């Protein structure tokens, strides 16, 4: 591809209605874009392909929750404390910058995970200046990326626009577990808007302040080492870029199957499964194998909730390797935190192979009440969640977490009870595949773009407009017939563009530019025998078919069940 491929794609995207800067008549704002008619159709098809994999094939449940959540949710999840980026600004022009990204761009170093103090030292050591005006950069501070607001008038309850869709799933775990017949593993998905007040978004649609996430939260028993259906994607060959290779001076990507990566201990079965699934999905969208890799997060860049995380990255001409999917092992972090903060028991239950003796603290409310007042019920609930295999573990007092604070509970506030149990409660672990739909959409545009012809060559099923319908000439009889064909195809469920403006060659060129895979032309012969021609975008070859068979033929072509050469009589 040529160096200006991003500009070429975005010029077509703006001109033809894929992607538009938002608020243009008021000067726009970084990090916000609109999808035009073609972009909205393309985005919907990407989302439906994602649903095909996760809802239909995996059988996961889908929910829809509010975009605005109460503050307690994010205090429990750790986002209020940890969802921060390092920020600096120019003391002269006032422009703001994300400090680690600025250091990486200007110095070519890896600044991910550096503390504000370390970044401050780096900036001063190399005398980094404002890239906009050359002014001096101010102190590096921490900036929370969540948009906050008040819920209700005056000083209402604090709320946040969600920075991820996941939290609503975790806080509904009790009902979701019940709907899953209390069996693990099970998955829950959500597609929706997420919001991050990025400090200085400068990469077009790659870094947005409002974007669409498609996330799955897959709950499983950590004692079960095998993931059901693992064989489905076990033989997918991926390019792995683990931590060890990243830390080498000349580290390399390791090409191997998901099965081999699991056998070598590089990834767990659940993570490997979803890496393989994601690669296959991206292939279906026209992203080639050589442009896809799976990179493991370094410890310093890992999110506060993750024990391991792998990004599926796609190679782009301007931006290099860009994360489009993150697959994180969130362990039991979220369920445990929400249990501690809410007082609700968000555990699952497993049967034991043999009964066993356990010891647990039974709260003594007449001691807890006077000592802890209004916190006593939550402390009692936290005590009831504790079990031990020996009585000695519970003697001498206990420490529990309530509302994010550790509370020391003296031994007189509980009695030690011995029980014989046939099962036990535990916090399920969670694997989270999180897809950035907007980034995937741009990757689809770039990797299906033909720079020589200046057209998009989407897979037929993915094209926003599936069929163009044209009269050969702008004669009333041909126009009327072509409009009837277009209406019939729309009623059959196809996305159709009717066009009778300009020469037939110009109409084909306009359709090719936006990736229309098949164009139907009504000509003189149509008026005589009710046949039309179908033109293939990529070969420009044409076949003639009967109008009565047109919908079935097009459906076979778009679904990949019919070869073009077999679709009709060659013209």
UniProtKB/Swiss-Prot annotation:
Its main location: cytoplasm. GO terms for cellular component: cytoplasm. PROSITE patterns: AA_TRNA_LIGASE_II. ATP binds at residues 196-198, 206-211, 323-324, 436-439. It is found in: Cytoplasm. CDD domains: GlyRS-like_core, GlyRS_anticodon. GO terms for molecular function: ATP binding; glycine-tRNA ligase activity; protein dimerization activity. Keywords: Aminoacyl-tRNA synthetase, ATP-binding, Cytoplasm, Ligase, Nucleotide-binding, Protein biosynthesis. It catalyses: tRNA(Gly) + glycine + ATP = glycyl-tRNA(Gly) + AMP + diphosphate. GO terms for biological process: glycyl-tRNA aminoacylation. InterPro entries: aa-tRNA-synt_IIb, aa-tRNA-synth_II, aa-tRNA-synth_II/BPL/LPL, Anticodon-bd, Anticodon-bd_dom_sf, Gly-tRNA_synthase/POLG2, Gly_tRNA_ligase_arc, GlyRS-like_core. Its EC number is 6.1.1.14. Pfam families: HGTP_anticodon (PF03129), tRNA-synt_2b (PF00587). Substrate binds at residues 98, 164, 211-215, 432-436. The keyword Nucleotide-binding applies. Belongs to the class-II aminoacyl-tRNA synthetase family. Catalyzes the attachment of glycine to tRNA(Gly). PANTHER family: GLYCINE--TRNA LIGASE, GLYCYL-TRNA SYNTHETASE/DNA POLYMERASE SUBUNIT GAMMA-2. This is Glycine--tRNA ligase. The lineage of its organism: Archaea, Methanobacteriati, Methanobacteriota, Methanomada group, Methanopyri.
């Amino acid at each position: 591809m040529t160096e200006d491929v991003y500009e070429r794609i975005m010029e077509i995207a703006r001109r033809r209605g894929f992607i538009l800067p938002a608020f243009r008549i008021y000067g726009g704002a970084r990090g916000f874009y609109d999808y035009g008619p073609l972009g909205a159709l393309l985005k919907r098809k990407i989302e439906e392909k994602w649903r095909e994999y996760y809802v239909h094939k995996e059988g996961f449940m889908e929910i829809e929750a509010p975009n605005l959540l109460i503050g307690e949710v994010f205090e429990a999840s750790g986002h209020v404390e940890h969802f921060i980026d390092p920020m600096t600004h120019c003391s002269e022009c006032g422009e703001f910058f994300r400090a680690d990204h600025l250091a990486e761009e200007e110095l070519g170093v890896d600044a991910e995970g550096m503390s504000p103090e370390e970044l401050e030292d780096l900036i001063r050591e190399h005398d980094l200046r404002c890239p906009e005006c050359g002014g001096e950069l101010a102190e590096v501070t921490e900036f929370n990326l969540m948009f906050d607001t008040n819920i209700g008038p005056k000083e209402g309850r604090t709320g946040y626009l969600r920075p991820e869709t996941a939290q609503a799933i975790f806080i509904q775990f009790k009902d979701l577990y019940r709907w899953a017949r209390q069996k693990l593993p099970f998955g829950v998905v959500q597609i929706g808007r997420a919001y991050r007040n990025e400090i200085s978004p400068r990469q077009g649609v790659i870094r947005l302040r409002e974007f669409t996430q498609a996330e799955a939260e897959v709950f499983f028993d950590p004692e079960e080492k095998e993931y059901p259906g693992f064989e489905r994607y076990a033989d997918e060959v991926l390019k792995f870029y683990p931590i060890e290779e990243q830390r080498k001076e000349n580290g390399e990507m390791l090409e191997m199957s998901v099965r081999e990566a699991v056998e070598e201990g590089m990834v767990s079965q659940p993570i490997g499964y979803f890496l393989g699934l994601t690669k296959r999905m991206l292939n279906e969208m026209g992203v080639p194998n050589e442009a896809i890799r799976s990179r493991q997060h370094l410890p310093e860049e890992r999110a506060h909730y993750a024990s391991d995380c792998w990004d599926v990255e796609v190679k782009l001409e301007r931006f290099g390797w860009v994360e489009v999917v993150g697959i994180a092992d969130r362990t039991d972090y979220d369920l445990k935190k929400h249990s501690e903060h809410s007082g609700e028991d968000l555990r699952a239950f497993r049967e034991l192979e043999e009964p066993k003796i356990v010891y647990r603290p039974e709260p003594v409310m007449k001691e807890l009440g006077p000592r802890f007042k209004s916190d006593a019920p939550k402390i009692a609930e936290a005590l009831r969640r504790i079990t031990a295999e020996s009585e000695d573990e519970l003697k001498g007092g206990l420490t529990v977490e309530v509302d994010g604070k550790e509370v020391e509970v003296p031994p007189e506030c509980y009695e030690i009870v011995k029980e014989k149990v046939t099962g036990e409660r535990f916090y399920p672990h969670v694997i989270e595949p999180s897809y950035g739909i907007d980034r995937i959409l741009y990757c689809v545009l770039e990797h299906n773009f033909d720079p020589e012809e200046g057209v998009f060559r989407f897979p037929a099923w993915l094209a926003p407009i599936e069929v163009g319908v044209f009269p050969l000439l702008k004669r009333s009889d041909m126009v009327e017939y072509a409009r009837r064909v277009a209406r019939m195809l729309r009623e059959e469920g196809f996305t159709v563009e009717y066009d009778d403006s300009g020469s037939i060659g110009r109409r084909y060129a306009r359709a090719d530019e936006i990736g229309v895979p098949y164009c139907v032309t009504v000509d003189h012969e149509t008026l005589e025998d009710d046949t039309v021609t179908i033109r293939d975008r990529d070969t420009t070859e044409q076949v003639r078919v009967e109008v009565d068979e047109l919908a079935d033929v097009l459906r076979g072509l778009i679904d990949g069940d019919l070869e073009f050469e077999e679709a009709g009589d060659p013209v």
